Design a protein with these regions (language model features):
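Residue-level detector of intrinsically disordered terminal segments
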Residues: 1-2, 47
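A structure-centric signal for secondary-structure junctions around beta-strands
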Residues: 2-4, 95-96
Length: 120
């Protein structure tokens, strides 16, 4: 059984396009999911949180409009992990993208050397 790569993307995001092209060029099949319409689940977010050693800020799109308009730079340090995860699961714009899951592995953002180790 081959684990399918789940890639949450936003179609107008350059980084997401680069990531998709990278996967295509390397012959890696993946399921593309629109992050705004279908944000990652609480379960997936918690799994990713474990991968990033509990650093919830790493899961946030800190350069996004919603992050700034919700003043999360100030609020996030005082927020409970559960509340932060709920926020992410209810607003795909807040999630760092691409948000990628393969079985129990995962990664946010696109970094070619990291992806090479994980997926090739």
């Amino acid at each position: 059984l081959i684990m399918k790569l789940k890639v949450y993307i936003y179609k107008n995001c350059d980084t997401c396009r680069k990531a998709g092209k990278y996967l295509d060029n390397n012959g890696i099949k993946f399921e593309s999911i629109p992050i705004r319409e279908e944000p990652p689940s609480v379960k997936e977010l918690n799994m990713m949180l474990n991968i990033y050693k509990g650093d919830v800020r790493k899961l946030f799109n800190t350069s996004g409009v919603d992050y700034r308009s919700l003043n999360l730079k100030e609020k996030l340090p005082k927020m409970s992990i559960d509340k932060a995860i709920d926020l992410l699961s209810s607003n795909g714009n807040l999630v760092k993208r691409p948000f990628v899951i393969k079985g129990t592995k995962g990664v946010v953002g696109f970094n070619e050397s990291v992806w090479k180790n994980l997926f090739l």
